[in-house]
UniProtKB/Swiss-Prot annotation:
Cofactor(s) needed by this chain: dipyrromethane
The protein's name in its UniProt record: Porphobilinogen deaminase
Gene that specifies this protein: hemC
Organism, as annotated: Brucella ovis (strain ATCC 25840 / 63/290 / NCTC 10512)
Family: Belongs to the HMBS family.
GO cellular component, one term: cytoplasm
Quaternary structure (record): Monomer.
Gene Ontology BP terms: protoporphyrinogen IX biosynthetic process
Keyword tags: Porphyrin biosynthesis, Transferase
Reactions it catalyzes: 4 porphobilinogen + H2O = hydroxymethylbilane + 4 NH4(+)
UniProt EC number: 2.5.1.61
Cofactor binding note of this UniProt entry: Binds 1 dipyrromethane group covalently.
Xref: InterPro entries: HemC, Porphobilin_deaminase_cofac_BS, Porphobilin_deaminase_N, Porphobilinogen_deaminase_C, Porphobilinogen_deaminase_C_sf
GO molecular function, a single term: hydroxymethylbilane synthase activity
Amino acid sequence: MKIGTRGSKLALAQAYLTRRLLQEAHGLPEDAIEILPMSTAGDRIQDRPLSEVGGKGLFTEEIEQALKDGRIDIAVHSTKDMPTVLPEGLHLSVFLEREDPRDAFIGRSARRFMDLPQGATVGSSSLRRQALIRRLRPDIEVVMYRGNVDTRLRKLDAGEVDGTFLACAGLRRLGLADVITDLLDPSVFPPAPGQGAIGIESRIGDERIDVLLAPLAHRETQIALACERAFLGALDGSCRTPIAGLATVEGDRLSFRGMILTPDGRQAHEVTAEGVVSDAAALGTDAANRVRAMAGPHFFDGWQ
């Protein structure tokens, strides 16, 4: 089996985790599964926000082409970076058990985000995080801040900004949880749909791969992400739209909280939903329709 992945430390850590789980599930030797790192346009373009150069697809196009061509058997992704519409013939077939979905703040002087002094600078390239920062702390200057985890932490250490945000899950997978100075409450600072979950993309109808992947599917994560990605898809979510959403599963019940914001954070509309897990996708779609109705028909005009 060949696994395609981006070449960053985090992407490779996620691919190695997937390989280990496959080995454990099927008793496979390490050399039975090959990891193929690939460079993507999103990795090469570091000087502009994703919203200006093509959105989330920049991190997946080359890998998905390799999957369609049969050069790899599966692709391992951070689900929050995946578009809701995938290339024909491909699907996100399995989600691994979710890590902590919260956003982590790493502060250089103030340890807690809300304790930053007036006029402090915070680095982030995520429109959702930028909008939430401006909503909660309009006095803070938000600067565009791209690069992999190491690059962002190095910029922070160099004093370019007073703090930055990263996904808690990614830091934990890299063994860097000790750099976190504050974990944001998702009811106040809601994460991106899919944040903290590893998604495995494969070819539709590839029965051999489906059998191998089946033991890796985590029930609660699969259900939660069906709801979150339905919400995102119904709102045409991309890197151009500040959208947050988190679903939690307890037994046969699901709870969801979603939010849409303007990039300046001045307007925000929040929606909640509860129901049975079998209706996960429908709950997400309904929540999207309700929050769109709250916001009005012109909410996305001019900045999407």
